[in-house]
């Protein structure tokens, strides 16, 4: 007799597709950036400001959505903001000026704010404690594959049509998330009289329901030193990652002189090399611990930036450098999400992730504009990447001070 598929896997599939589309759009901008710089006649700093407009709105809305995720129906939130993301992506095919482009990408950022914290929180609700690393590792492949495919698919579309058509196509994928999530997502296992997949028999649905009613106050969370240590680490690691991610294709095209389609493969190398890291490192962390694995990830971010600088215009070495970066880039975000569930009260996961996203967003806002400005002033991205290496080191320092619950974190 065939065993029915646990609905947790349906949730994970829909979440996977949602993350895939979201990151195809979000990171697709960095791939399209060289063409948009030429077409819109903007500087690297202005191109960075467009990315920063996305991250500004993303940062403003993410804490609100984290708060609402713990209190409202997460399915309805994801459906609504999928539509907003689709609308903003459609408008990205229409801008005629820098202010318009910033506004339209900011709308995309509003929608995208619900495509990570609520989705990750939902996925964790459907899986047991010892299966979260696995589930989040699988989920994170969505953004690596999305980013990787964009590096291969967008350049031919730009050549045949233009960058505006690429945004139009991406908007269709975003709009498709509305019916997909509306039909498949469920807010919690108890809605279907299920317990999380992989949960031990001693954990009954009623226990989770009682836990959900025991709301933890935001003021109590803010007193926890661990909250601030991880948040600060998150800021620096986000800055480090997105200086590289935002500008690596532009660096290859406009500074090193590689053909556009070839430079776009640097993005694909980051993404596809990340599949192994996204699968192996989160699962490994279920046994070795999140802290050890995240210290390793932060350290390797710093080393990756230095490796990219060292590679120069040697294509094979550069490809190897960005691939090394990709392994740890893909694993970082689900690992931080799992840390929220492990080091803080379970019923506050959405609020914790939402709070951290403020700091994450600050790093993301600063990275494109500051990285682009330094490249304009110095005439090279080398100093921008060196700054990313320093940020990776600072991320390691702050995360290394994290204490396990009950070991004096207050």
Residues of each region from the PLM?
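Extracytoplasmic gate region of multi-pass secondary transporters
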Residues: 29-33, 224-276, 281, 367
């Amino acid at each position: 007799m065939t065993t029915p598929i646990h609905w947790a896997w349906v949730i994970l599939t829909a979440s996977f597709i949602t993350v895939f589309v979201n990151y195809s759009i979000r990171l697709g901008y960095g791939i399209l950036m060289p063409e948009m710089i030429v077409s819109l006649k903007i500087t690297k700093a202005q191109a960075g400001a467009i990315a920063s407009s996305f991250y500004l709105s993303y940062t403003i809305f993410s804490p609100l959505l984290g708060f609402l995720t713990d209190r409202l129906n997460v399915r309805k939130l994801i459906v609504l903001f999928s539509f907003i993301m689709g609308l903003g992506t459609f408008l990205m095919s229409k801008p005629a000026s820098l202010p318009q482009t910033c506004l339209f990408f900011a709308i995309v950022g509003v929608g995208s704010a619900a495509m990570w914290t609520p989705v990750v929180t939902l996925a964790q609700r459907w899986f047991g404690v010892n299966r979260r690393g696995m589930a989040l590792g699988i989920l994170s492949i969505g953004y690596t594959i999305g980013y990787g495919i964009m590096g291969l698919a967008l350049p031919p579309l730009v050549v045949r049509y233009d960058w505006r058509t690429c945004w139009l196509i991406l908007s269709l994928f975003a709009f498709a998330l509305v019916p997909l999530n509306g039909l498949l997502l469920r807010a919690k296992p108890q809605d279907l009289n299920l317990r999380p997949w992989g949960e031990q028999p001693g954990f009954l649905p009623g226990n989770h329901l009682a836990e959900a009613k025991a709301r933890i106050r935001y003021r109590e969370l803010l007193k926890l030193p661990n909250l601030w240590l991880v948040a600060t680490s998150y800021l620096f690691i986000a800055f480090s990652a997105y200086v590289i991610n935002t500008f690596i294709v532009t660096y290859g095209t406009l500074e090193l002189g590689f053909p556009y389609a070839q430079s776009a493969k640097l993005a694909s190398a980051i993404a596809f090399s990340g599949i192994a890291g996204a699968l192996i490192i989160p699962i490994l962390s279920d046994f070795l611990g999140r802290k050890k694995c995240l210290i390793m990830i932060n350290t390797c971010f710093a080393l990756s930036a230095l490796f990219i600088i060292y590679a120069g215009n040697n294509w094979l070495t550069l490809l190897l450098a960005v691939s090394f970066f990709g392994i740890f880039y893909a694993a970082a975000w689900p690992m931080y999400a799992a840390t929220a569930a492990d080091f803080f009260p379970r019923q506050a996961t959405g609020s914790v992730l939402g709070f951290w996203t403020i700091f994450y967003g600050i790093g993301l806002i600063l990275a494109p504009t500051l990285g682009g400005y330094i490249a304009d002033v110095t005439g090279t991205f080398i100093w921008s990447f060196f700054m990313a290496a320093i940020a990776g080191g600072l991320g390691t320092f702050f995360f290394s001070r994290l204490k396990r619950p009950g070991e004096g974190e207050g």
